[in-house]
A protein has these predicted regions:
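Short, composition-biased linear "edge" segments at structural boundaries
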Residues: 216-224, 502-510
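Acidic, low-complexity Ser/Thr/Gly/Pro-rich repeat segments typical of extracellular/periplasmic
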Residues: 16-195, 209-215, 236-431, 448-472, ...
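Extracellular interaction modules
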Residues: 222-227, 518
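Phox homology (PX) phosphoinositide-binding domain
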Residues: 505-509, 513-523
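Acidic, glycine-anchored loop motifs typical of Ca2+
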Residues: 199-208, 485-494
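Conserved structural position at the C-terminal beta-strand
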Residues: 196-198, 303, 482-484
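Long, low-complexity intrinsically disordered regulatory regions
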Residues: 228-234
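Bacterial Sec-dependent N-terminal signal peptides
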Residues: 1-32, 523-527
Length: 527
C-alpha cells in the first residue's frame, strides 16, 4: 500500500505542475506567429469587446499599459490576460457606431522562452459595415535641434478649434518610432487638425510650459503621407517664477520669459540697501541685483502683470549670518590653471563679486620665468566681474600671473588673497582655420559653429552671400548650424500654438567637419 500511495502522489504532483514550454534544441530566433483570432481580424459589423488571439508558442506580454495603443482613443485601458498560447483582451468601453478600431501592440508581445519580439502586431475591426483604410503619415522632429525621438504623440481632431489640444483628447492618434516616423492608420475620409505632442503626463492633453507641441499650418486630408511636424516649447506668460538671495549683497529674480522690458517699481528705498547695479542674463530671463549694504534683510518691489500689480518680497542674506556659515570673501572663478590659452585673445579672470578697485602694481606677470613690466588690464563687462589681462603673447611660451593680496577690491571692500594662475600659449600651427562660403542666402541668418555636443563655439550673423572665416580653432570635429532669423533679433525664437506662429527654422550642414592643426578648410553651403 505504501508504494501505491507514493505512485498516486507522484501522479497528482505532475498533474498540478505549472506548464512551461519545452527546452533544449537549437536557439529559437523567430517571433511568435498568430494562428487565429476571435473575432477574426479585419472583421466588420462587430462589437469586439472580447478578443482572443492564439499563437504558435507560449507568449508573454510586457508593458501593455504603454505599448498597447488603441485608436480611436478609449476611456479605459483594456484588460489583458495570457493563458498558455492565448492572449485575451477585454474592452469595457461602449464602442462607437460605424467606427474602425485599431489595436497596435507595439513591442509588448514576445515568446516566453527567448523573448523574440512580435513587433507592431495590429488587430483591426469595425463596428460598421466599412473598414476604414486611409492613413496619414509623416515625421516629427525637434524644431531647435532636429532630433527625432520615439513615442511622441501625433493626434487627429475633427474639432478645429485652436485650443482643442488643451481640453479634448484626440479622435485618432499614433506614436513615433525611433526615426521620428508615424503612421495613423485606418481613419475615415475627411480633413483633420493634426497636432504632435510630447505627452509627459500621459493624459493626451497639452500642458503648456511642460510639454513640447507641434502643429500644421493647415488642415490635413486623410491619405496624405508627408506631413512634417516640428516640436517646440512655448514661452510662458511673463511672470516672476522665483526670487532668491544667494549671498550677502546679491539677489536674483528668475522670470518665466525674457523680462528686460519689464518695469520694476521699487518699494524698498534703494539708498538704504546702497544699490550698486543690476544685470540680466544672456537669455534676459534672470536679473541679478547687487547692493552694498550687506546688513539689509529684505527687498520689495511690484510689477504690472496683465493689468494687475504683483508685489514681491525677497528675503536677503545678512552678512553677519552668512559669516557664521560660510566665509564671505572675494574669490576667482577661473579654474583653468595650467591650461592652454589662445595667444590671439586676452586672458580672462572671472570674479565672484563686482570689482571697484584694481591695484596694477600687485599684478606680476612672467613670460617663461622672465617678469613683464607692462600689461594691459580691462573689464569686458559693465558689472566689472570679468577682468581681462592682455599682452602681446608669444607663441609656445609659459605664463604665470601672480595677484598679490589687495590687488583687487570688490564693492564690499573685500580684498583678494594671493592668486597664482599658469597657462601655456600655443603656437599658431597648433590651430586650424575654417572658412564657410554661403550662396543663395538672402534672409537674415545666424551661423553657429558647434561641437559634437551642440555647444556653440563661435557665432556670426549674415544676411547675404558671403564667406565667414573662423581662425584659431582647436583641432576637433565641428558642425555648422544655421538659424533662419526671420525677425532679425539675433536669436532663435520658439513658436506659439494659439497665434499660429511656427518656430524659426534651423538647418545643419550635412557633413561633420574635421579641423586639423596647421590646416585651412573651406566649406561651401548652397541654399
Amino acid at each position: 500500500m505504501r508504494y501505491i500511495g507514493l505512485i498516486c502522489l507522484i501522479f497528482i504532483f505532475n498533474s498540478c505542475a505549472i506548464q512551461v514550454p519545452p527546452s533544449g534544441g537549437e536557439k529559437d530566433t523567430k517571433p511568435p506567429k498568430v494562428l487565429s483570432t476571435t473575432p477574426e481580424n479585419y472583421s466588420t459589423n462587430i462589437n469586439a469587446n472580447n478578443i482572443e488571439i492564439e499563437f504558435d508558442e507560449y507568449v508573454q506580454l510586457k508593458d501593455a499599459n504603454t505599448q498597447l495603443i488603441i485608436s480611436p482613443l478609449l476611456n479605459y485601458q483594456p484588460t489583458t490576460k495570457i493563458r498558455k498560447k492565448k492572449l485575451y483582451i477585454h474592452i469595457s468601453d461602449t464602442l462607437k457606431a460605424n467606427t474602425t478600431y485599431t489595436l497596435n501592440f507595439g513591442t509588448s508581445i514576445s515568446d516566453l522562452n527567448e523573448g523574440n519580439l512580435l513587433e507592431n502586431y495590429q488587430y483591426i475591426f469595425s463596428t460598421g459595415s466599412i473598414l476604414d483604410s486611409l492613413k496619414i503619415k509623416g515625421k516629427v522632429e525637434n524644431a531647435f535641434n532636429l532630433k527625432k525621438d520615439k513615442n511622441q504623440l501625433v493626434m487627429l481632431y475633427k474639432n478645429f478649434d485652436d485650443s482643442i489640444p488643451y481640453k479634448e483628447r484626440p479622435l485618432y492618434f499614433s506614436k513615433t518610432n525611433g526615426e521620428g516616423e508615424y503612421s495613423i492608420n485606418n481613419i475615415s475620409p475627411g480633413s483633420y487638425k493634426i497636432i504632435a505632442l510630447e505627452d509627459k503626463d500621459g493624459n493626451y492633453l497639452y500642458s503648456k510650459g511642460d510639454e513640447l507641441i507641434g502643429f500644421s499650418d493647415s488642415l490635413v486630408s486623410s491619405g496624405k503621407e508627408d506631413v512634417k511636424l516640428r516640436l517646440f516649447k512655448e514661452s510662458l506668460a511673463l511672470k516672476l517664477a522665483r526670487s532668491q538671495s544667494s549671498g550677502p549683497g546679491q539677489a536674483t529674480l528668475i522670470f518665466t520669459a525674457a523680462a528686460d522690458t519689464l518695469k520694476l517699481n521699487w518699494l524698498t528705498d534703494l539708498s538704504k540697501i546702497d544699490f550698486y547695479s543690476q544685470v540680466f542674463s544672456i537669455e534676459k530671463d534672470t536679473l541679478t541685483i547687487w547692493y552694498k549694504n550687506t546688513d539689509s534683510d529684505s527687498l520689495s518691489f511690484y510689477y504690472n502683470n496683465g493689468g494687475k500689480n504683483d508685489t514681491v518680497d525677497v528675503r536677503l542674506f545678512k552678512r553677519k549670518s552668512e559669516n557664521s556659515r560660510n566665509k564671505f570673501s572675494l574669490e576667482s572663478q577661473t579654474i583653468d590653471a595650467n591650461s592652454n590659452h589662445n595667444f590671439s585673445e586676452p586672458y580672462q579672470i572671472e570674479w565672484s563679486h563686482p570689482i571697484s578697485k584694481v591695484e596694477r602694481g600687485k599684478f606680476i606677470l612672467k613670460e617663461d620665468s622672465v617678469p613683464i613690466s607692462k600689461i594691459d588690464l580691462f573689464f569686458s563687462d559693465s558689472l566689472k566681474t570679468k577682468l581681462n589681462v592682455n599682452h602681446k603673447w608669444k607663441q609656445k611660451s609659459q605664463y604665470e600671473l601672480t595677484i598679490l593680496p589687495g590687488g583687487l577690491v570688490d564693492i564690499f571692500g573685500l580684498r583678494n588673497d594671493t592668486l597664482i594662475l599658469k597657462w601655456f600659449s600655443k603656437s599658431e600651427v597648433d590651430y586650424g582655420t575654417l572658412a564657410l562660403k554661403f550662396s543663395g542666402r538672402k534672409e537674415a541668418s545666424i551661423v553657429q559653429l558647434i561641437d559634437e555636443k551642440e555647444n556653440v563655439i563661435r557665432q556670426v550673423r549674415v544676411n547675404r552671400d558671403t564667406v565667414v572665416t573662423f581662425n584659431y580653432l582647436d583641432p576637433m570635429i565641428y558642425r555648422f548650424k544655421l538659424i533662419n532669423d526671420k525677425n532679425d533679433n539675433g536669436k532663435w525664437d520658439t513658436g506659439n500654438l494659439i497665434n499660429h506662429i511656427q518656430p524659426e527654422e534651423v538647418e545643419y550642414y550635412p557633413e561633420l567637419i574635421t579641423v586639423r592643426s596647421n590646416w585651412d578648410v573651406e566649406v561651401k553651403w548652397d541654399k
